[in-house]
């Protein structure tokens, strides 16, 4: 087995013959890396217009999720100024 980080990060050891948990772990790693979605998209030919639409949608969704996470983190801060001081 290669000592390259790319291969180490996607290597799962089977402990005590427990193949199911190792498979679930490997599946989770591949999903988090985005490889499962990439393989699904490359399985069949995707027309260029559909690919542009999908990539545009994914880009917009990524921006939306980042902004929403930023807003939620701002709201979850404890030391922010109280906006309703007079009430």
Swiss-Prot record:
InterPro entries: Ribosomal_bS21, Ribosomal_bS21_sf. Its main location: mitochondrion. Signal peptide: none annotated. GO terms for molecular function: RNA binding; structural constituent of ribosome. One of its GO terms (cellular component) is mitochondrial inner membrane. Keywords: Mitochondrion, Ribonucleoprotein, Ribosomal protein. It is found in: Mitochondrion. GO terms for biological process: mitochondrial translation; translation. Disulfide bonds: none annotated. PANTHER family: MITOCHONDRIAL 28S RIBOSOMAL PROTEIN S21, SMALL RIBOSOMAL SUBUNIT PROTEIN BS21M. NCBIfam families: S21p. Belongs to the bacterial ribosomal protein bS21 family. Component of the mitochondrial small ribosomal subunit (mt-SSU). Mature mammalian 55S mitochondrial ribosomes consist of a small (28S) and a large (39S) subunit. The 28S small subunit contains a 12S ribosomal RNA (12S mt-rRNA) and 30 different proteins. The 39S large subunit contains a 16S rRNA (16S mt-rRNA), a copy of mitochondrial valine transfer RNA (mt-tRNA(Val)), which plays an integral structural role, and 52 different proteins. This is Small ribosomal subunit protein bS21m.
């Amino acid at each position: 087995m290669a000592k390259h980080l790319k291969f180490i990060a996607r290597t799962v050891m089977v402990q005590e013959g427990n193949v199911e948990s190792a498979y679930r772990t490997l599946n989770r790693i591949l999903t988090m890396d985005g490889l499962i979605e990439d393989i699904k998209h490359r399985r069949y030919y995707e027309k260029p217009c559909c690919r542009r639409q999908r990539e545009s949608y994914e880009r917009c969704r990524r921006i939306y999720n980042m902004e929403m996470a930023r807003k939620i983190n701002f709201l979850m801060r404890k030391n922010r100024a109280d906006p309703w001081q007079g009430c």
